[in-house]
């Protein structure tokens, strides 16, 4: 199965806060299967963001085997993004974002994130994944759109 989705850490963090694994087991089981079956990946840089948390979300992602390590092709796209938007990446805040977009571009996958675009006059420092992804030809969907695409009902 080819990778269809690249998951932003904010999706998993929001799930953990609003749909805890011990209560929403069917949601988490389906999401785990999506990752385990190779239909979705989490870039290592997004995993690093998860590791800053106090829960076991990073360990859960590692267990699925869905952590994606950037290769030279991904690094080249990250460099293009950084050149185009030099003020966008702030290490403590969004260091994973260009890797999420670059991974999706290289794999021909869709980014899943909870971020929304800002207006076109937004300064680089305030850009969001959907704006940058659009410029690089990468499709972005929200979590509920992912569920609809997969036909998931809860």
Protein language model features and the residues they cover:
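Acidic, PIN/NYN-like endoribonuclease modules and their adjacent C-terminal/linker elements
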Residues: 2-4, 16, 117-154
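Conserved beta-strand termini and adjacent loop/short-helix elements that scaffold enzyme active sites
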Residues: 43-45, 70-71, 143
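Residue-level detector of structured alpha->beta connecting loops
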Residues: 39, 65, 105-108, 137
């Amino acid at each position: 199965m080819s990778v269809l989705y690249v998951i932003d850490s904010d999706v998993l963090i929001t799930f953990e806060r609003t749909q805890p694994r011990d209560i929403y087991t069917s949601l988490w089981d389906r999401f785990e299967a999506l990752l385990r079956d190779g239909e979705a990946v989490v870039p290592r840089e997004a995993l690093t963001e998860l590791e800053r948390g106090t829960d076991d979300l990073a360990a859960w992602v590692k267990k699925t085997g869905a952590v994606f390590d950037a290769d030279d092709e991904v690094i080249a796209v990250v460099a293009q993004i950084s050149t185009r938007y030099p003020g966008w990446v702030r290490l403590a805040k969004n260091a994973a974002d260009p890797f999420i977009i670059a991974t999706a571009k290289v794999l021909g996958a869709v980014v899943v994130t909870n971020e929304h675009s800002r207006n076109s006059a937004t300064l680089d420092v305030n850009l969001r994944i959907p704006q940058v992804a659009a410029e690089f030809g990468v499709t972005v969907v929200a979590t509920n759109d992912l569920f609809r695409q997969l036909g998931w009902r809860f």
